[in-house]
């Protein structure tokens, strides 16, 4: 007589993992590193100024009159806070049943929504050319993005290569900025790795080190400015930002808040909402390269750290 096998059994208890795998990226480098400051209006403003050019003819006769000079006012910049939200709508039945990997479906969905909101925030701030808009009764307010607040003279549309990168870091140095970071889309990582090479030959081989390292963590430009290289998934593929985090800020009119909305039948609806905006203290304190890296392009830098 044949042995009784599982193939003919009834009532076998299913084996279901009590967790949920989700590898969707959550890290938001930009908003994690910049300062948050409160605002009390939907429009917020700030000022910037500049010193006059150096006057190498600043020489005067003894006992001469001090003549009047024309003074220039500060420049006022404005931006707006933008309402961002996520809505979760879960039936009472879905919230009551026992589920693998979470205790209550509502709490699980709210946790996901909070992470998604943070990613939306990062992506909006990093847009290249999204202008601010005061909005109206029928149109939402828009916060101007990082790229749109950078002065036109500090932007360049070109392939991402060594010459362009160092041209922009030199511009920042000349203007008096103090850049410490380069933020780029991961698709351009090979450009930064290429800076370790010269004429197709790898420059650094460490004895007894079995690792093959392509990553470049820091770049020192010809003027001695040391910049940390940070990939950011939420950067546009053709945008590379050069800046100092201390020159950026996130205006907060309303911090993220979970709000229970009116119950609809046998379902619960919650909203997570915030009202925030972006600030760049000075339009010449950051630079933007609009373009992608082309394999085989102009790499070959020497001043790198990994």
UniProtKB/Swiss-Prot annotation:
Transmembrane segments: none annotated. GO terms for cellular component: T=7 icosahedral viral capsid. The keyword Metal-binding does not apply. It comes from the Viruses. It is found in: Virion. The lineage of its organism: Viruses, Duplodnaviria, Heunggongvirae, Uroviricota, Caudoviricetes. Keywords: Capsid protein, T=7 icosahedral capsid protein, Virion. This is Major capsid protein.
């Amino acid at each position: 007589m044949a042995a009784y096998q599982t193939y003919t059994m009834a009532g076998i208890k299913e084996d279901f993992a009590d967790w949920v795998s989700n590898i969707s990226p959550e890290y938001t480098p930009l908003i994690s590193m910049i300062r948050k400051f409160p605002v009390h209006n939907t429009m917020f403003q700030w000022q910037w100024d500049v010193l006059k050019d150096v006057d190498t003819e600043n020489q005067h006769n003894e006992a001469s009159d001090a003549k009047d000079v024309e003074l220039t006012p500060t420049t006022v910049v404005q931006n707006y806070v933008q309402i961002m939200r996520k809505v979760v709508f879960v039936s009472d039945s879905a919230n009551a049943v026992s589920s693998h990997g979470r205790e209550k479906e509502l709490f699980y969905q709210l946790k996901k929504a909070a992470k998604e909101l943070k990613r939306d925030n990062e992506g909006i701030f990093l847009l290249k050319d999204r202008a601010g808009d005061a909005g109206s009764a029928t149109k939402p307010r828009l916060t101007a993005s990082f790229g749109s607040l950078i002065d036109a003279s500090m932007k360049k549309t070109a392939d991402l290569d060594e010459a362009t990168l160092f041209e922009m870091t030199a511009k920042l140095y000349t203007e008096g900025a103090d850049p410490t970071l380069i933020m780029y889309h991961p698709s351009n990582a090979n450009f930064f790795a290429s800076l370790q090479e010269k004429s197709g030959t790898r420059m650094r081989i460490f004895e007894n080190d079995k690792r093959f390292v392509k990553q470049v963590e820091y770049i020192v430009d010809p003027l001695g400015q040391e910049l940390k290289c940070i990939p950011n998934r939420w950067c546009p593929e053709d945008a590379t930002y050069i800046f100092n985090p201390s020159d950026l800020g996130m205006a907060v009119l309303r911090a993220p808040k979970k709000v229970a909305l009116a119950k609809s039948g046998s379902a619960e609806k919650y909203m997570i909402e915030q009202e925030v905006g972006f600030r760049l203290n000075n339009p010449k304190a950051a630079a933007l390269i609009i373009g992608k890296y082309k394999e085989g392009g102009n790499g070959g830098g020497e001043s790198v750290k990994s």
